[in-house]
Amino acid sequence: MICYKQQSLQFPITTVCPGEKNCYKKQWSGHRGTIIERGCGCPSVKKGIEINCCTTDKCNR
Protein backbone atom coordinates (compact mmCIF):
# COMPACT_ATOMS: atom_id res chain seq x y z
CA MET A 1 0.00 0.00 0.00
CA ILE A 2 1.28 3.47 -0.90
CA CYS A 3 -0.24 6.35 1.06
CA TYR A 4 0.29 10.07 1.38
CA LYS A 5 1.82 11.06 4.71
CA GLN A 6 1.33 14.56 6.12
CA GLN A 7 1.33 16.33 9.46
CA SER A 8 -0.74 19.55 9.45
CA LEU A 9 1.14 22.28 7.53
CA GLN A 10 3.77 20.05 5.91
CA PHE A 11 3.58 19.18 2.21
CA PRO A 12 2.21 15.63 1.70
CA ILE A 13 4.74 12.98 0.61
CA THR A 14 4.18 9.36 -0.43
CA THR A 15 5.24 6.50 1.80
CA VAL A 16 5.14 2.71 1.50
CA CYS A 17 3.05 1.07 4.24
CA PRO A 18 4.10 -2.59 4.62
CA GLY A 19 1.29 -4.81 5.86
CA GLU A 20 -1.33 -2.04 5.81
CA LYS A 21 -4.56 -2.30 3.81
CA ASN A 22 -5.79 1.28 4.35
CA CYS A 23 -4.76 4.90 4.03
CA TYR A 24 -6.45 7.69 5.98
CA LYS A 25 -7.04 11.41 5.87
CA LYS A 26 -8.31 13.09 9.02
CA GLN A 27 -9.14 16.71 9.62
CA TRP A 28 -10.41 18.91 12.39
CA SER A 29 -10.72 22.57 13.25
CA GLY A 30 -8.08 24.14 15.47
CA HIS A 31 -7.20 27.68 16.51
CA ARG A 32 -5.15 28.01 13.28
CA GLY A 33 -7.94 26.78 11.02
CA THR A 34 -8.46 23.34 9.50
CA ILE A 35 -5.76 20.80 10.38
CA ILE A 36 -5.16 17.85 8.05
CA GLU A 37 -3.23 14.66 8.76
CA ARG A 38 -2.64 11.80 6.32
CA GLY A 39 -1.02 8.41 6.81
CA CYS A 40 -1.17 4.61 6.80
CA GLY A 41 -3.87 2.50 8.43
CA CYS A 42 -7.27 3.58 9.74
CA PRO A 43 -6.89 4.87 13.32
CA SER A 44 -9.68 5.48 15.80
CA VAL A 45 -10.43 9.16 16.33
CA LYS A 46 -11.99 11.30 19.03
CA LYS A 47 -15.33 13.03 18.64
CA GLY A 48 -15.10 16.11 16.43
CA ILE A 49 -12.41 14.69 14.15
CA GLU A 50 -13.46 13.71 10.64
CA ILE A 51 -11.68 10.67 9.18
CA ASN A 52 -11.84 9.06 5.76
CA CYS A 53 -10.20 5.66 5.26
CA CYS A 54 -9.66 4.15 1.82
CA THR A 55 -8.17 1.01 0.28
CA THR A 56 -6.29 1.91 -2.91
CA ASP A 57 -2.80 3.33 -3.47
CA LYS A 58 -2.57 7.12 -2.94
CA CYS A 59 -6.30 7.33 -2.21
CA ASN A 60 -5.90 9.73 0.74
CA ARG A 61 -4.94 12.78 -1.34
Curated annotation (Swiss-Prot):
One of its GO terms (molecular function) is ion channel regulator activity. It comes from the Eukaryota. Disulfide bonds join C3-C23, C17-C40, C42-C53, C54-C59. Keywords: Acetylcholine receptor inhibiting toxin, Disulfide bond, Ion channel impairing toxin, Neurotoxin, Postsynaptic neurotoxin, Secreted, Toxin. Expressed by the venom gland. InterPro entries: Snake_3FTx (IPR003571), Snake_toxin-like_sf (IPR045860), Snake_toxin_con_site (IPR018354), Toxin_cobra-type (IPR054131). Belongs to the three-finger toxin family. Short-chain subfamily. Type I alpha-neurotoxin sub-subfamily. This is Short neurotoxin 3. It comes from Naja annulifera (Banded Egyptian cobra).
